[in-house]
Amino acid sequence: MENEKKILQCHSRGDKRFSALCAKVVIHNRTYTIEKIYQWSKRKSDGTIAGKSKPFDYFVCPFCGMEFPAEEVSFLYKGLWIMYFNDHPDLLEYASGFDEFVDIFKGKSINCQADVIAELGRDKEKVISEVKESDWYKTMARWTKGISNLRQLGVSLTYNINKGETAHEAIPD
């Protein structure tokens, strides 16, 4: 029995705390599941939401509404999980005690919650470093700094994705 691997079921029928359908993060003072944000972000060339497991041409960043190449979407997905575990460090510590991570709904998607959770459990700092090197993150850092500079100048600027302040619709409730 000592050699049995500990397996964490990362899906909605397993430990829901490790399911993108249940794990929640706050963006612009609103709470969304990681899955809702991720699926909302993926777009076809005409700007419509691509749909789960469907091909997509680019993604819309939920933080600022900017468009990014589809190749960068994994950094957004990892970033959302990093946000979640920053709010729930005890869960990442718990997950790091497992040997294997399973998502029974994995499919052919380029991003899998079990894979990301396993990566973060093994070496969170490495994943954070990789995300910070992405064009998506660097753009977000510049955008955030710009907002901060405007606030220091006394300019009140609030971006609210739910008011549709970009050409794209808001994340639906």
Describe each model-derived feature in a short phrase.
Residues 1-40:
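N-terminal accessory segments that precede or flank the first globular/catalytic domain
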Residues 9-13, 67-71, 102-110:
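Short, charged/polar micro-motifs that form catalytic or ligand-binding hotspots
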Residues 10, 22, 61-64, 112:
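Generic recognition of cysteine residues
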Residues 16-20, 29, 101, 166, ...:
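Intrinsic structural disorder
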Residues 45-102, 120-122, 126-159:
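Long, contiguous internal "core" modules enriched in hydrophobic/ aromatic residues
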Residues 106-120:
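Active-site nucleophilic cysteine motif
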Residues 151, 156-173:
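Intrinsically disordered, low-structural-confidence terminal and linker regions
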